[in-house]
């Protein structure tokens, strides 16, 4: 019986940088860790195609799940299509150590079912406004790691990173958060360390 792969759920609103994070993690870790990806889109496999086109991993290691309807249902109430995709990847690649599960774009209330992910990373972006951490919601308060992406846009949207950091601390208590600019790779190393340490990879 092969060892269960570590499953890391990556959630967050549309356009926050989930696919950018998935791609960056694949590029940084694929030489060291045997990995695969499941993406969720409502009606297309757009994110999966993007990852394949950018050579994130070999195409057969990326499965695009079309959720239809509400994307949060596929990661929460009825995770069966995602669990099936994970099962397919584990059968095809018995040595796989890490499977990233990227949710469809969602609201702040979406969370991953515990049976679907061992660790959850929630991505929000500065461009959505500095009040986002304050608004809370399970993604912000309960995820294992909160990623506040696109910090380069803070001056353009008049967002204060200090205010965001303060609000994230208030909402999350001891749970960690990290500021990132995934275009430049700023903060990526912290996310990788977190996955390695918490996931014992």
Swiss-Prot record:
MF GO annotations: GTP binding; GTPase activity; nickel cation binding
Entries under InterPro entries matching the protein: CobW/HypB/UreG_nucleotide-bd, P-loop_NTPase, UreG
Keyword Cytoplasm: yes
Compartment annotation: Cytoplasm
Binding site for GTP: 12-19
One GO CC annotation: cytoplasm
Pfam families registered for this protein in UniProt: cobW
GO biological process terms, semicolon-separated: urea catabolic process
CDD domains, alphabetized: UreG
Record keyword Chaperone present: yes
Classification via SUPFAM superfamilies: P-loop containing nucleoside triphosphate hydrolases
Alphabetical UniProt keywords: Chaperone, Cytoplasm, GTP-binding, Nickel insertion, Nucleotide-binding
Quaternary context: Homodimer. UreD, UreF and UreG form a complex that acts as a GTP-hydrolysis-dependent molecular chaperone, activating the urease apoprotein by helping to assemble the nickel containing metallocenter of UreC. The UreE protein probably delivers the nickel.
Described function: Facilitates the functional incorporation of the urease nickel metallocenter. This process requires GTP hydrolysis, probably effectuated by UreG.
Listed HAMAP family: UreG
Stored NCBIfam families: ureG
Similarity field: Belongs to the SIMIBI class G3E GTPase family. UreG subfamily.
Protein name: Urease accessory protein UreG
Organism for this UniProt entry: Dechloromonas aromatica (strain RCB)
Name of the gene this protein is made from: ureG
